[in-house]
């Protein structure tokens, strides 16, 4: 059975980032005992770089003579690692072993909670390009991994905490080279463990490039805090849009990057953002949602509150000090109880959850904000009862019965050879959905059954009716179109909005405005009925389970004799578990939750048996 990681980012309750220099074995043992009792069995830990490698330069006649340790002694190993700190980390692992806790080790911890942690002699050097800094990073990583690779408590090696935050963004080449140096150094010493990213903020076109990182790393990580994520706070924390952020971003990494991905940091940013009760509900939805949608696990930030710590970063960053699962005196917050309950569910049910069935492929195109548009499409699809797989238009497009091209923009939508392949698949029977944001496709009328008459960049919107519901729309550019073979599904007095066209054996849906782009920065957008557009696209998809409520997200996980189905309430209201089953299946067992009513932010897990 594949284990789903249930964990936390750990700093000792008494000292925070000073835990290694202010070591207290008794407190650390009490911390880990407390966390373990609450089903927290994985800790991400951070050997602070300048504490572990306290180097000091010595000069003669204006030139560097040698490096020693900070206390003026000669190094006791070729890596300039402090033996006292190494012994403390060894003892830390001993304690973890006592309680059956595994550890993800963040190696180059030069950044933490807004503070730079770099050895003093290296502070004026670029950590990504300076030869001296790179030498000491390589020595640190090599020495640390050599020292502890035999320890069974270590689950994986993490590059370090958000290493892409240590300095301003380098070029793509520099980001690649730095990642390769650290990863290859780890692998040269220990090839038995995964190397995980430790970073968020990877993108298709940026310096920290998702394809480069996929080439070098074994596991991606996401840190999808709504408070910090772009467009993450447009809606309330407890809205379906925000509740699906972590799931969508993690799925984006898995599908586009082609590697497993761990939700390595998640949290609410404390009681000034939401109540502790809401934080627990937020965690509960995300535990079930990330588990059901293919994540390696989910880890909270962080273990204990740090209000009592009066040094940087805690004296700087007021948002950092109330993020714990518990108070420093071991008073458990509701979120810790949520993690314990979810751990009990996994331990008792012993579910080996297969991969969820995917209903469509969303092709992310050039000249768009791919991650944000993908997220919007993901939420709309969930509300319409479908689950998406992401891909990027320059890479191989997975086989599917349904494809989405959301909010296409600009003259360079996608490579022509990829478009030709897609068009052929549609002609042979697939369904294609296109929404327009001034994107240009050749032979557009032939593909869509819609002819463009004119175009302008004026902001012209309006409303239309679909399934008896009024839907508002807007755009920053307008295509004036007429039908040349398509069927108009939706139109108003002024224009045609939504069309359907038989293309060969397939079907093409065209939406004459950028629904997904519009939603990126629009508050409460998902409260409306716009998801009905997606419901049209998925009307004929084959499903084992269908939910009639837009706030109930369903994943179906086929098994040898049936399926496991996870039904998640992404809302703050009770909803009837209003589902329909394919005639070939019956409910064999309710594993978790209530089959009649799903409470706010709760989930129901059922086992289905195939009878035909």
What are the residue ranges of the model-derived segments?
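Active-site mouth of glycoside hydrolases
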Residues: 1-217, 279-281, 309
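Active-site clefts of carbohydrate-active enzymes
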Residues: 12, 162-172, 224-236, 247-283, ...
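Alpha-helical scaffolding within the catalytic cores
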Residues: 27-31, 139-145, 202-212, 243-253, ...
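Catalytic-core region of carbohydrate-active enzymes that cleave or remodel glycosidic bonds
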Residues: 179-194, 211-215, 219, 234-305
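Short, charged N-terminal beta->alpha structural module
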Residues: 180-182, 190, 357-384
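A short, well-structured beta->alpha microelement
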Residues: 202-203, 380-398
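Aromatic-rich peripheral "rim/lid" segments of glycoside hydrolase catalytic domains that contact
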Residues: 303-359
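A conserved amphipathic helix/loop scaffold
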Residues: 410-612
């Amino acid at each position: 059975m594949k284990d789903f990681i249930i964990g936390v980012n750990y700093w000792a309750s008494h000292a925070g980032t000073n835990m290694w220099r202010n070591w207290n074995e008794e407190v650390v043992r009490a911390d880990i005992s407390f966390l373990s009792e609450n089903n927290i069995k994985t800790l991400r830990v951070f050997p602070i770089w300048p504490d572990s490698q306290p180097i000091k330069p010595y000069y003669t006649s204006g030139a560097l003579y040698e490096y020693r340790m900070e206390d003026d002694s000669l190094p006791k190993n070729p890596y300039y690692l402090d033996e006292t700190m190494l012994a403390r980390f060894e003892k830390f692992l001993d304690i973890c072993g006592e309680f059956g806790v595994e550890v993800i080790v963040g190696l180059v911890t030069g950044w933490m909670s807004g503070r730079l942690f770099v050895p003093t002699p290296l502070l004026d050097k670029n950590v990504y390009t300076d030869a001296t800094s790179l030498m000491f990073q390589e020595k640190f990583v090599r020495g640390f991994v050599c020292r502890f690779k035999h320890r069974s408590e270590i689950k994986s090696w993490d590059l370090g905490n958000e290493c892409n935050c240590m300095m301003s963004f380098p070029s793509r080449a520099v980001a690649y080279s730095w990642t390769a140096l650290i990863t290859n150094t780890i692998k040269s010493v220990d090839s038995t463990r995964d190397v995980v990213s430790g970073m968020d903020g990877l993108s298709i076109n940026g310096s920290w490039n998702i394809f480069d990182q996929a080439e070098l790393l074994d596991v991606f990580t996401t840190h999808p805090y709504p408070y910090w994520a772009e467009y993450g706070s447009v809606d309330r924390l407890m809205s379906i849009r925000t509740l699906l952020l972590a799931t969508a971003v993690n799925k984006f990494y898995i599908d586009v990057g082609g590697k497993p991905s761990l939700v390595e940091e998640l949290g609410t940013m404390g009681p000034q953002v939401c109540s502790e009760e809401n934080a627990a509900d937020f965690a509960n939805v995300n535990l079930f949602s990330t588990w059901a949608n293919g994540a390696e696990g989910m880890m909270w930030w962080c273990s204990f509150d740090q209000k009592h710590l009066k040094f940087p970063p805690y004296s700087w960053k007021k948002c950092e000090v109330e993020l714990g699962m518990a108070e420093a005196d071991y008073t458990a917050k509701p979120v810790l109880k949520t993690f314990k309950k979810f751990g009990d569910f996994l331990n008792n049910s012993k579910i080996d959850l297969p991969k969820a069935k995917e209903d469509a492929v969303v092709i992310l195109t050039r000249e768009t904000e791919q991650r944000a548009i993908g997220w919007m499409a993901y939420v709309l699809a969930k509300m319409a009862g479908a689950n998406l797989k992401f891909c990027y238009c320059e890479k191989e497009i997975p086989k599917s019965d349904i494809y989405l091209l959301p909010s296409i923009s600009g003259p360079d939508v996608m490579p022509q050879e990829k478009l030709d392949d897609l068009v052929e698949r549609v002609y042979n029977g697939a369904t294609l959905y296109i929404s327009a944001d001034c994107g240009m496709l050749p032979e557009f009328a032939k593909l869509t059954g819609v002819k463009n008459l004119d175009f302008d960049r004026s902001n012209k919107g309006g409303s239309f009716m679909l399934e008896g519901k009024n839907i508002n729309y807007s755009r920053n550019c307008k295509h004036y179109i007429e039908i040349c073979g398509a069927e108009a599904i939706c139109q108003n007095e002024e224009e045609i909005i939504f069309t359907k066209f038989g293309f060969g054996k397939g079907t093409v849906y065209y939406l004459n405005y950028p629904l997904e782009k519009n939603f990126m920065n629009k508050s409460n957008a998902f409260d409306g009925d716009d998801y009905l557009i997606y419901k049209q696209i998925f009307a004929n998809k084959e499903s084992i389970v269908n939910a009639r409520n837009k706030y109930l997200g369903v994943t179906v996980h086929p098994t040898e004799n049936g399926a496991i189905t996870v039904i998640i309430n992404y809302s703050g209201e009770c909803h009837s578990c209003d589902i329909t089953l394919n005639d070939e299946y019956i409910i064999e067992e309710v594993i978790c939750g209530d089959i009649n009513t799903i409470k706010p932010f709760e989930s129901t897990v059922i086992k289905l048996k195939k009878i035909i």
